């Protein structure tokens, strides 16, 4: 699935043919495709409300509709493994926090993070939700009991990641992902900084290129 601004396209892998699935004059960014194949959730960026989440059904009338359309920003969405829930980031509290809401009842959202958070990721069994702390220096974990209602535990610090690239350059999202078994994490970290490099200035450098005369 790719984007050719400002439209969203799906590519048929067998043929390589791209088909437009969402057309809009506003900038769009794909977030996730539901595991059951029924929904695509994407971010729409407008001057009026900033980034909002929209749902595109892949059956029925196929018309996109707003998952959120508020004065605050919402982004970074991901479907639960059973496709019933969406984890996402919202700034409605005044800072980025992680929330979970039913796919078709986004107003029944529940706040998951307690001290700020970004980049939510579900475990494959849907029983855990991970996210990056507000300072982008730790991965947090919340126990989830999915069902007709959502029961969650309190966030716990899973491990520290030091100064992530997001913390260093001020981006909102830590670059990481979770393995399918939920036991391993791939985290983007800055390369070792060897310190400032020494700069050598060579004057009259053309003279160095002249062949030496035989003595």
Which sequence ranges carry the predicted segments?
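Conserved loop/turn at the beginning of each blade in beta-propeller domains
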Residues: 24-26, 70-72, 113
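Conserved blade-ending motifs and adjacent loop-strand segments that build the rim/top face
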Residues: 73-74, 107-120, 154-177
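Residue-level detector of Asp-centered blade-edge/turn motifs that repeat once per structural unit
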Residues: 35-36, 81-82, 124-125, 180-181
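Short helix-to-loop capping/linker segments positioned immediately adjacent to catalytic or ligand/cofactor-binding
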Residues: 75-76, 87
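Hydrophobic beta-strand positions
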Residues: 10-11, 32, 78, 121, ...
């Amino acid at each position: 699935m790719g984007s050719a601004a400002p439209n969203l396209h799906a590519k048929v892998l067998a043929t390589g043919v791209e088909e437009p699935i969402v057309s809009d004059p506003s900038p769009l960014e794909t977030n996730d495709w539901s595991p059951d194949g029924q929904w695509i959730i994407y971010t729409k960026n407008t001057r009026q409300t900033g980034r909002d989440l929209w749902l595109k059904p892949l059956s029925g009338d196929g018309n996109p509709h707003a998952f959120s359309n508020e004065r605050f920003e919402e982004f970074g969405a991901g479907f639960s493994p059973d496709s019933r829930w969406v984890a996402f980031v919202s700034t409605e509290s005044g800072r980025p926090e992680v929330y979970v809401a039913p796919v078709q009842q986004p107003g029944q959202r529940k706040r998951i993070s307690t001290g700020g958070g970004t980049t939510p990721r579900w475990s494959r069994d849907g029983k855990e939700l991970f996210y990056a702390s507000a300072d982008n220096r730790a991965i947090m974990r919340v126990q989830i009991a999915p069902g007709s209602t959502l029961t969650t535990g309190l966030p716990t610090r899973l491990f520290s990641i030091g100064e992530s690239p997001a913390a260093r350059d001020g981006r909102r999202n830590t670059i990481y992902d979770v393995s399918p078994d939920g036991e391993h994490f791939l985290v983007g970290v800055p390369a070792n900084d060897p310190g400032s490099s020494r700069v050598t200035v060579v004057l009259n450098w053309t003279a160095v290129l002249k062949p030496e005369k035989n003595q």
